[in-house]
């Protein structure tokens, strides 16, 4: 049910993280095909993933069609996926909703995003119920 509400880029990052954690290397084009997105989308997601998880990356190599990522010893996959899901605006706003913080201006100030984006995400959260 949540998969209908959480942002697609978050799901892609989690999937890429899981694949790289398990296999340490992925084929960029095959991954793009299996996720039904373009190769530049996968490359952008990989770049974003490496940027936000740089504190736990031991080695990162990009070749023409392959991408290799080795995580530091002692890093748990659950820690990585929890961090990635924590970047979801939907989940953040859901948390704010349960904590009684749901005015548009408060949310815009807390997340440093536009009111337009806040209205869009608030609608998604309210549709969830």
Each model region followed by its residue ranges:
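Short, basic/aromatic recognition patches that contact phosphate-bearing ligands
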Residues: 1-129
């Amino acid at each position: 049910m949540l998969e209908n509400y959480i942002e697609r880029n978050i799901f892609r990052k989690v999937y890429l993280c899981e694949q790289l954690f398990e296999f340490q290397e992925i084929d960029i084009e095959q991954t793009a095909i299996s996720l039904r997105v373009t190769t530049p989308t996968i490359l952008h997601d990989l770049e974003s993933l490496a940027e936000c998880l740089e504190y736990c990356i031991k080695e990162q190599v990009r070749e023409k069609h392959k991408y290799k990522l080795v995580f530091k010893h002692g890093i748990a996959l659950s820690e990585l996926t929890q961090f990635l899901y924590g970047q979801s605006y939907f989940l953040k706003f859901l948390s704010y909703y349960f904590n009684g913080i749901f005015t548009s201006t408060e949310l815009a100030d807390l997340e440093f995003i536009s009111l337009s984006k806040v209205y869009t995400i608030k609608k998604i959260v309210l549709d969830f119920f």
